[in-house]
Curated annotation (Swiss-Prot):
Intrachain disulfide bonds: 130-133
Subunit structure: Homotrimer.
Alphabetically ordered keywords of this record: Antioxidant, Disulfide bond, Oxidoreductase, Peroxidase, Redox-active center
Catalytic reaction annotation: N(6)-[(R)-dihydrolipoyl]-L-lysyl-[lipoyl-carrier protein] + a hydroperoxide = N(6)-[(R)-lipoyl]-L-lysyl-[lipoyl-carrier protein] + an alcohol + H2O
Function: Antioxidant protein with alkyl hydroperoxidase activity. Required for the reduction of the AhpC active site cysteine residues and for the regeneration of the AhpC enzyme activity.
Record EC number: 1.11.1.28
Record GO biological process: cell redox homeostasis; response to oxidative stress
Official protein name in the record: Alkyl hydroperoxide reductase AhpD
Key word Disulfide bond present: yes
Length: 177
């Protein structure tokens, strides 16, 4: 049980995150594919090897290999898009009409249904701090019939997985001293 491994590795000051990640993995707000893909996409977005490997191990019990690839693909394409769209926003109106010019074919054919991939893209955009992408994907989800509560559940996954990764990274540095 890899989530259990993460929970066991968390220090006392991260008890809230231990409880939060346990609760999220039992959530019924999202279906199994949405939930476990959100966990995988969030773990990839944290760039923390331990968090990604532990979550991937357990996620494979809940996801097809195609869904795992789609979740990892979401994290990858959103890493690029979040940087580019944040930069366009910061650069102002002079850059608004500049051609984006980057490939993102996975968005059109992700290997899972559109709403699921959009949810995972929302999760990653929350971690990466891209307001433009977060809003755009959340609006698409609403248009696809996904509820605000389901979107928020994805955001909760993003926040908790990021917090778990941060605590484990802090402890890795601390133990290396």
């Amino acid at each position: 049980m890899s989530i259990e491994n993460l929970k066991s590795a968390l220090p006392a000051y991260a008890k809230d995150q231990k409880l939060n990640i346990g609760s999220l993995t039992r959530s019924t707000e999202l279906n199994e594919e949405q939930l476990w893909g959100s966990l995988v996409a969030a773990a990839a977005a944290t760039r923390n090897d331990l968090v990604l490997s532990e979550i991937l191990e357990e996620a494979r019990e809940h996801l097809s290999e195609e869904a795992v690839d789609a979740a990892l693909g979401s994290a990858t394409v959103m890493a690029m898009n979040n940087v580019a769209y944040r930069a366009k926003s910061w650069l102002g109106d002079d850059f608004a009409q500049v051609k984006f010019g980057l490939r993102m074919n996975i968005i059109a054919k992700p290997g899972v249904d559109k709403a699921t991939f959009e949810l995972w893209s929302t999760v990653v955009s929350a971690i990466n701090g891209c307001e433009h992408c977060l809003s755009a994907h959340a609006n698409t989800l609403l248009e696809e019939g996904v509820t605000k509560e389901q979107i928020w559940e994805g955001i909760k996954v993003a926040g908790v997985v990021e917090a778990v990764a941060q605590a484990l990274q802090a402890e890795a540095v601390r133990s290396a001293e």
